[in-house]
Amino acid sequence: MHVLPALLLPPTLPGLRKRLLAAAVASIVASTPAGSAWAACSEAPQAAQLFVRGTMNNWGVADAYKLAWQCDAYYLNVDLNGKYEFKIGDAAWSEQTTFGTFHQQFAGAQTIKVTFAHGKPQIAVGPRSYVDPDTAVPTDPVALSLAHDSRSLADKAPFGAVKAGSEVTLNLAALPGITKATLVIARRTLEGNQEVLSYAPVARVAMQRQPGKNRWSATYRYADIGVYGYHFEVEIKGRKYLYQNNRQPLYWTREQGVNGTGTAQAVVKGQTIRPFRQTVYAPDFQVPAWASDAVYYYIFPERFRNGDRANDPKPGVTRYHDQGIELHANWLDKPYRPRSGDGSDNLDNNDFFGGDLQGVIDKLDYIRDLGANTIYMTPVFQAASNHKYDTADFRNIDPHFGSNADFTRLTVEAKKRGIRVIADASFNHSGSDSVYFDRYANYRAQGAFRGEHVDPASPYADWYVFDTKQTDPNRQYKGWGGTVDLPELNKNSPSYRQFAYGAPDSITRLWLQRGASGWRMDVAPWVPDDFWREWRKVVKAERSDALTVAETWFDSSKFLLGDTFDSTMNYIFRNAVLDYASGVKAGTAYASIEMMREAYPPQAFYALMNLLSTHDQARSLHVLGDHGNDPAAAALARQRLRLAMFFQMIFPGSPAVYYGDEVGVNGGDDPLNRATYPWADLGGKPDLALLADVKALIAMRAAHPVLRHGSIDAPLLLDDHVVVLARRDGGTWAITATNNAATATTVTVTLPAGAPAGPYVNPLDGSTATAQDGRLTLHIPALFGAVVIGGAK
């Protein structure tokens, strides 16, 4: 993503705030306990399911914040502390069912009550009063004894994601007293940005009690690829109970539950079932072998390096839609923040520094010396903005970045240094200022909306969907995320599909032929699944070792089934690791990582783009506490960043370093997260000590294949501060440990069966350790980690 500062529509999206504020007037009032004095019950006033969406959940749609209608009001129990901003809205941010902008100071366990009068919501927040049927805890001792751990081979075999055609055996343990047990299988439908989420029944399998044991067992064969859910139903003394997924949230993901152990609950009317999730992928799913060895250098080209001043945008000449542009005279300026009083104009994304492809070419040796072997650049095609996701011409490099020949030259020079280049594009939308749309009549081509007039004769007419009944040009078409600068493309248009991937000279093929080693595809959830299935076939036919990476922020299981993408931008990893480095309990943060280990096919799990900073989120140092005005906080944030990057380098997947993170570049939300790299020859002050540490961590990963390819199981130790993992690659073992406490610690762990006694060597400092009676002692620095490697060389 590129325009929104969060995954889903925030209140600051241009135009949206004004419309929503006009849609409703709401107030915060004292709470009335649920059920204290019922009026006549009525139907819910809104047909759509409503959610609380705000800063407490990244403005996302999450079942943990789903409002429940009961008689005369909507209710939600929350456990929050501090001030939050939120709206009431449906899963799709529909204009008709998005209400208010509320600011509320929460104080622990409370109930939110929402009533409607004349179509306008009134919010009441007070002491916990609503009895949620989904949270009722059973009192029957047999029901309370129900136990299943989806990550234990004793309860589910085989582990994790399975190939289509596989049989999976599931076990449920309990005290005596169950008269009947059933395994319930359902198949998930997930569409768009999680707006559509449902499960359709597939099978009910009678479970058999294992002779002589208080365990019930059933086996089910998954014939087709997909994401499935399962839960258990049991009867005890004539009453039905469920055993289902837990309530722990998964970052960015609508569904509650991270698998592992679940919870028991009595069956009641209207409850929401939380299935354990099961991924079933294509037996022939292959990911390019090089992906697990990749270390990305992630570049926002306009802000990396100006290698050719002759192609810089020129104020008074270069146009931005029907306006002008701004060019910074000083490379070290901060990006402009429109409407902030910094002296800039009021236009978003029209300030430039002059970064270009020649600048990337000039710094290939720097990237190689850092240890990166894969460059991912945000789009470089012709576009009006500085971010280039508003594509004007998919076939040509933006003239302010260089030429098509420069792109090929970049890939050739990169290859000489052992570096691949991944291209980026959005096939979901174009720019309004483009050859295809041409809202501002800046092109000679016959655009579909040239000069704000729909042209049915345009060769691009069916690439967009128009509503000619509207008189306001902004309402005659749909802009992605409500942004009129980004008209959504009609992905069902045969002509557009031919252009995007179907034709011999399609965009997909063209840039692979020009040297790209793969594609990162923007806002992948907004594009239909069948589009991606056809697209993947073209990519692999054109270049079998090309990598396909989706931009998804939530649980990406549906995109990693072998029929669409190889990998994804791992925002779940980002949030988990930055939370952990910030001091969140290790067990809480690591649960989301364990969910991915279980849910994702192994070939995809080892190729995930494990990032920390991005062009869409605040930089890591900002998240970790450096807000620019406290030297002590800045130093602490840098050490926390070292911990986060240590975790990146010892974990499966492909670490991604966002340009400048390695030298301490900081910045909050867009546009401050897109600051320039502080090159010393331009007067910048890169943090060379941090750079040396990052180089050492990347070199450690490169020198030890066990850190890239080694197997990984559940942690050997997981407490409030420490995570200890064992990795194995053939006869080589790595034991890794991280510590988010402010003090150093010493832990002793029992090694897995087959692990050698030692000696184990720490590749960072040369220290050694040897196990005694199968137990290994590790000394872990404060806010950092330790790794020791032993066994066969």
Question: Which residues fall in each region the model found?
Answer:
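Aromatic-rich carbohydrate-binding modules that target alpha-glucans
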Residues: 41-83, 91-106, 173-225, 235-256
